[in-house]
Regions:
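N-terminal pre-catalytic "stem/leader" segment of glycosyltransferase-like enzymes
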Residues: 1-92
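Donor nucleotide-sugar binding/catalytic pocket of nucleotide-sugar-dependent glycosyltransferases
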Residues: 141-189, 194
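Aromatic "clamp/platform" in nucleotide-sugar-dependent glycosyltransferases that forms part
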Residues: 284-286
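Nucleotide-activated donor-binding/catalytic signature segment of Leloir-type glycosyltransferases, i.e.
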Residues: 244-268
Length: 394
């Protein structure tokens, strides 16, 4: 049960990333289709997914799933996997399964991307948290398992009182090979020394991503050094925000020559920009792993993110590419270091996230119980690095 495709979002590539792994693993997969309101692949109402488009696609997709269930095509031997926990029309599943024989009740897994358990999610900005948290409790009553992207998200789910089994997949679905294909292969990764001194920002320009912190960093850089550096904003659509003051400030800074805005860019063009960037910077309050880190790490960029929520796990507790939240001084000094040379562990983050879909498959097949965070010892795994990194003695 995949998400509808948006040009400016990762859903355009998500099916491809999943499909490659499903085929390699030899799975018998049915991709349940949905209907779209139009062919624009654009977000018109809302920030993350289009409000009308998500509802229309999700409900039409559920209609097709219900038809398959009614025809006996879905049985207890099957798994229904929802790419997003928020699926309009999903309440039809317990309504049906509570009334059919046990042999017609499939296992159901949902992947959570944020929602009401995250105090910085957009559902709180728009006042949706009350009904969304109720929706989440409903889903917990009938699913086989919920997939979290990291240990900190697991903790948020547990303190919210979620009752379904929770699994940490430790990453977002990502296809490193597909991303490299878009730049013509790894041979086309531009050498770090040949790249301009450029720091990029690729998060949405909404308040939960703290774009003001990035602009403060730009101002600080201009005050402390005369060494040239381009600061760039990358946006799939026109630059916009749930706080228009950020856009106004960014446009004024661009007019003053302090930064460059690259908006309305397609994914391939974005990858070309990353291939000419030395550091991708992030300062988000709300970012559970983030595909931006995997893409930049794949294409030869250094990445500098806050040591906050999911990122210590994503970075395997790397002290050089994680800065103290929210210390602009620490961010500045580490940015300066990362502008000089490529980090010795470049590529390992994207390698790890490239295995996320395999971890999902293992869980769906009953082979991933070591990722199960049910029970009272779910915090035992927080400090452990999920993959090995190269250590350089001081």
């Amino acid at each position: 049960m995949g998400l509808e495709s948006y040009e400016a979002r990762y859903t355009l590539q998500l099916t491809e990333w999943n499909q490659r792994v499903f085929e390699r693993r030899g799975l018998d997969v049915v991709y349940v289709p949905g209907l779209t309101l139009d062919n624009s692949q654009k977000i018109v109402v809302g920030q993350v997914l289009d409000a009308h488009g998500r509802s229309y696609f999700g409900m039409s997709q559920m209609m097709n799933l219900v038809r398959l269930m009614q025809q006996g095509e879905v049985t207890a031997e099957d798994v229904i996997y929802f790419e997003d926990m928020f699926q309009p029309g999903i309440e039809s599943l317990p309504y049906i399964m509570d009334q059919v024989p046990a042999e017609l009740r499939p296992r159901i897994y949902v992947r959570c991307l944020a929602q009401a358990i995250d105090p910085d999610d957009f559902v709180h900005v728009w006042g949706m948290a009350g009904w969304m948290s109720t929706y989440e409790k409903m889903v917990n009553h009938f699913v086989t398992g919920v997939l979290a992207t990291n240990e900190e998200m697991v903790a948020h789910m547990r303190i919210a009182g979620w009752t379904a089994p929770i699994y940490n997949i430790s990453g977002l679905a990502f296809g490193k090979e597909e991303v490299l294909e878009r730049i013509g292969g790894s041979a086309n990764i531009r050498p770090f020394a040949d790249r301009p001194r450029r720091v990029g920002f690729a998060a949405r320009f909404d308040q939960e991503k703290q774009p003001g912190f990035f602009m403060d960093l730009i101002e600080m850089y201009g005050e402390l050094t005369t060494e040239p550096c381009e600061f760039a904003i990358y946006s799939g659509g026109a630059l916009r925000s749930n706080n228009p003051e950020f856009v106004t400030r960014a446009r004024a800074m661009e007019a003053a020559g302090k930064l460059k805005i690259y908006d309305n860019i397609g994914k391939n063009e974005y990858y070309d920009h990353l291939n000419n960037t030395r550091v991708l910077f992030n300062c988000a309050l709300q970012d559970w792993v983030s595909n931006t880190v995997s893409e930049a790490d794949t294409i030869g960029c250094n990445v500098l993110y806050p040591a906050y929520r999911s990122f210590p796990e994503t970075f395997a507790n790397d002290p050089n590419r994680l800065y103290i939240p929210w210390s602009i001084d620490d961010a500045y000094h580490k940015m300066q270091n990362l502008l000089r040379e490529p980090h010795h562990n470049m590529g390992l983050i994207s390698d790890w996230n490239n295995g996320t879909v395999d971890r999902v498959v293992d869980i769906l097949l009953g082979l991933g119980e070591h990722w199960n965070r049910t029970g009272n010892r779910y915090r035992d795994h927080v400090a452990e690095a999920k993959y090995h990194v190269v250590k350089i003695p001081m």
